[in-house]
Structure formats: C-alpha cells, structure tokens
C-alpha cells in the first residue's frame, strides 16, 4: 500500500512548474489529487491526464488564487468530488521582479492577494474538513528567510508572512492532530524562473551547490511532509534551496 492511499490532496496552482510536480508526486504516492489553475486549462488537463495514465485519480478546478471565493469554492469542489480532504498544498504564488520603488500598488496588491490572501482562504476552507488529522503545507520561499538578490521586496514580504502564518497556525490546530509546515524553495528551474533566464546568474551564485534546483526535489520534500513519517513535524520552515541560506 502506498503511503497516501485513500488520502485526498488539493494542490493550488498545480498546472505547471513546482505545483504540477507536487501533484504528480502525491498521486504517485497514492493520493487522489485536485489541482487549481487560473487560466491555462490545457496545461491543467495535461497534468490530470498524466496522473490518470499512471493509474491515479485527479481533477482540475478553475480558480484564480487571487479570488477568495473561487479558492474557497475549489476546496468545496475537491470534497464534493472525492469525499474528503486530507492534504492541502498552498502552492499558488506569483512574483514581480522589479525594484520596490518601481513597483506599483496594483502590482503589490496582486502579489499579496495571491501569496497571502489566497493561502489564508484555502487554509480556512480546508480546516472545516479536517476535524482530526490532516496536513497543511505552504510553499513559501527561501527569501522568506533571507533576501540575497534585489528586486523581490513585495514577494519576500509575502513569503515572510506565510512563514509566520505557518508557525501561528501550527499552534492553533496541533491539538486536532493537524500539522502545518512551510516548504521554502530556493531557485528552482521552472518556466517562470528558468535556469537559463535573466535572473539565473545571481541566484545560482548564492547557492552552495552552484546550481538551480529541480521541481522533483521540491516535490519529494512535500511528499515527505504530507506522509506518515512526518507526523511529529509541525510549525517547521523547511528550506530546499541548494544552501542559499547556509
């Protein structure tokens, strides 16, 4: 029996990059998986198809992470489809790589709405279905610990908020057997932050391993936190950053 057999997971922003890798890994470990996507239905469908081809169960739900009601609705649709919710992975996120002085408040609002408000909304809705036991997993960022490159001020602020939300919530729901943890990736090779992109050189330079990470390396840590082996870990901020914060 796989370690997540009979479990149900919801991965927000699961149509590409880190989110898609997480969804596929949780499905490979036995979970039925729902993913949300904002606009790209074809990418979301491709993730669902890949999971089903490997014998898993999956569904894609359209929900802009900046829309609180849509995010809450995605949680309810997940439960309606699979009958329960055991694991929530708050992966949806965005960044605007500009200096703080050049960033508009509309741009900052978008980052806050997705990275913070969307995370709060999904978590609050999910907790209603986790009366006893469950896993809440945030996908934060290594810049929530330490900012080593310029141009990420609003993003870093939101990821710092996610870090403290994790620690505070872990205290509130621990008595119900629910764990809350924050996985903090460093530079990971995705379409939004490619290892050959304009921002790659300074990010790679501050890692101890002198390379970008892979999406499967993040997914592996998330799978561990979602599984039974991590049952005594909560309120933790777990970096997978190639030693960026070493």
PLM-predicted stretches and their roles:
Residues 128, 171-172, 231:
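Alpha-helical segment proximal to the catalytic Tyr-Lys
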Residues 174, 179, 233-235:
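Short, small/polar-rich loop/turn modules that mediate ligand/substrate recognition or access, typified
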Residues 8, 15-16:
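Conserved glycine-rich cofactor-binding loop
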Residues 207-218, 229:
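A conserved structural motif in NAD(P)-dependent oxidoreductases
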Residues 99-100, 104-112, 203:
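Substrate-binding pocket helix/loop in short-chain dehydrogenase/reductase
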Residues 146, 223, 234-246:
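Short C-terminal tail/terminal secondary-structure segment
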Residues 123, 158, 166:
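Active-site helix of classical SDR
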